[in-house]
Amino acid sequence: MRIVNVKDYVIIPLGKQGENLATRVLFPFANEWRLLFGDGTFQLLHQRQSDAEPHAVTVGIDGENVVWNVENVDVAVPGVGKCELNYLVGDALAKSITYSTKTAESLSDVGDTPPEPWESWVDEVLQAGAQAE
C-alpha cells in the first residue's frame, strides 16, 4: 500500500481511477489537535472533481495520524477534487484544514462501478452499530 503523508503535499495524490485500498493517506494532526482543543472527533469530507457535494469518508486513528484508506469510490472520478479534515469538539467545529486531491485517469477498463459514496459510508455505520450491540 502506498503511504501519503499530507505534510509533504499541497495536492494529495490519491492514486489512479479504479484502484481500491492502494493508498493510505496520513494526516499528522491527531495528537496536536487533541492537545489544543480537548477530546473530539475527526471527520473527513471528500469532493471528487464532478461532485456537486462532498461525501463523508471513514477515517481511523493510528498513533498521531488520522488515517484515510482510499477506496475505489474515492478515486472513481479522475481529476482534481478537494478533501477537508474537520475536528469537532461536541457540536462545535474546533479546527479544519482543506487540501486539493488528485486522481489519475486510467487508460484501461476500471472494473466494476463502485457504489455511490454514501452507500459505503452507510454500510460502515450500520456494521459498526451491529458490532456495538
Residue spans for each PLM region:
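Non-transmembrane elongated oligomeric "stalk/shaft" segments that connect baseplates/barrels to distal
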Residues: K95-E133
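N-terminal assembly/attachment segments of tailed bacteriophage virion structural proteins
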Residues: M1-G111
